[in-house]
């Protein structure tokens, strides 16, 4: 549970959700090594102050199922391909973290013997307690579920204090701030307000899952240096949904 002392992090354990697109940097496709290294520094700063970090990464930088689905690709096949993309991203992130001397384990919701370990909740929690970063890949292992839903699910399973969703904007707005200059930023929202206002922060399944299990969500801009440390130590960043 969150701690109250100002000398300690507010959160003991967090689940960080990164979009695959965030790994592209300024490119249109793939993985930017500079972004990986910067993410590793941010995550390493949390480990350094005793925060346990679980990580879920999307796959949109390597595979965009929606476009191929519209062109006739079977939805289930597309989702399976997307799961494989998240595993590739997880392996890349593990490499960056381990180059920064941060012990990291990648677990997959689908068996991939010899490449990554099969997801085991109890093992994951033990690793987190030992100070390892645990990357949860392959989504939930089921088609029709997004990586946002996977992030909320894993966050609930590992009893994280919050799910932190990294985006390209500094919180949740009433409209897309890049398209609407009158868009208003929200500092705090309830789950039901997110659903009623159709703000599109996460998909319906993810929001309902978080609401039903009382999992706080924090939406923030990952491009702001030091943002993760500020969040876990209680500073105001982005939008809190609870």
Swiss-Prot record:
Keywords: ATP-binding, Cytoplasm, Kinase, Nucleotide-binding, Pyrimidine biosynthesis, Transferase
Source superkingdom: Bacteria
Binding site for UMP: 59, 79, 140-147
Regions annotated as coiled coil: none
Localization terms from the record: Cytoplasm
InterPro entries in alphabetical order: AceGlu_kinase-like_sf, Asp/Glu/Uridylate_kinase, Uridylate_kinase, Uridylate_kinase_bac
GO biological process, alphabetically ordered: 'de novo' CTP biosynthetic process; UDP biosynthetic process
Regulation acting on activity, per entry: Inhibited by UTP.
Keyword ATP-binding in annotation: yes
Pfam families named in the record: AA_kinase
Entry keyword Calcium: no
EC number: 2.7.4.22
Catalytic activity: UMP + ATP = UDP + ADP
Pathway: Pyrimidine metabolism; CTP biosynthesis via de novo pathway; UDP from UMP (UMPK route): step 1/1
Binding site for ATP: 17-20, 60, 64, 167, 173, 176
A cellular component annotation (GO) from this entry: cytosol
Enzyme class: transferase
Main localisation: cytoplasm
Family matches, as SUPFAM superfamilies: Carbamate kinase-like
NCBIfam families: pyrH_bact (TIGR02075)
PANTHER family assigned to the protein according to its UniProt record, in alphabetical order: URIDYLATE KINASE, URIDYLATE KINASE PUMPKIN, CHLOROPLASTIC
Family: Belongs to the UMP kinase family.
Described function: Catalyzes the reversible phosphorylation of UMP to UDP.
Assembly, per entry: Homohexamer.
Protein name: Uridylate kinase
Species annotation: Marinobacter nauticus (strain ATCC 700491 / DSM 11845 / VT8)
Gene this protein is translated from: pyrH
């Amino acid at each position: 549970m969150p701690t109250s002392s100002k000398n300690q992090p507010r959160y003991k354990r967090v689940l960080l959700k990164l979009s695959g697109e965030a790994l592209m940097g300024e490119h249109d496709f793939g993985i930017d090594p500079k972004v990986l290294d910067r993410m590793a520094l941010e995550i390493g700063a949390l480990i350094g102050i005793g925060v346990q970090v679980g990580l879920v990464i999307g796959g949109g930088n390597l595979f965009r199922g929606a476009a191929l689905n519209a062109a006739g690709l079977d939805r289930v096949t597309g989702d399976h391909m997307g799961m494989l993309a998240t595993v590739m991203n997880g392996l890349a992130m593990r490499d960056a973290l381990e180059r920064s001397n941060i012990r990291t384990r990648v677990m997959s919701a689908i068996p991939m013997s010899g490449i990554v370990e099969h997801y085991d909740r109890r093992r994951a929690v033990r690793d987190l307690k030992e100070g390892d970063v645990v990357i949860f890949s392959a989504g939930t292992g089921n088609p029709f579920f997004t990586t946002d839903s996977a992030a909320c699910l894993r966050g609930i399973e590992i009893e994280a204090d919050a799910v932190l969703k990294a985006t390209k904007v500094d919180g949740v707005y009433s409209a897309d701030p890049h398209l609407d200059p009158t868009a208003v930023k929200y500092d705090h929202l309830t789950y039901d307000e997110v659903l009623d206002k159709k703000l599109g922060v996460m998909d319906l399944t993810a929001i309902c899952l978080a609401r039903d299990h009382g999992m706080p969500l924090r939406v923030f801009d990952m491009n702001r240096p030091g943002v993760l440390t500020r969040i876990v130590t209680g500073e105001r960043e982005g939008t809190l949904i609870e």
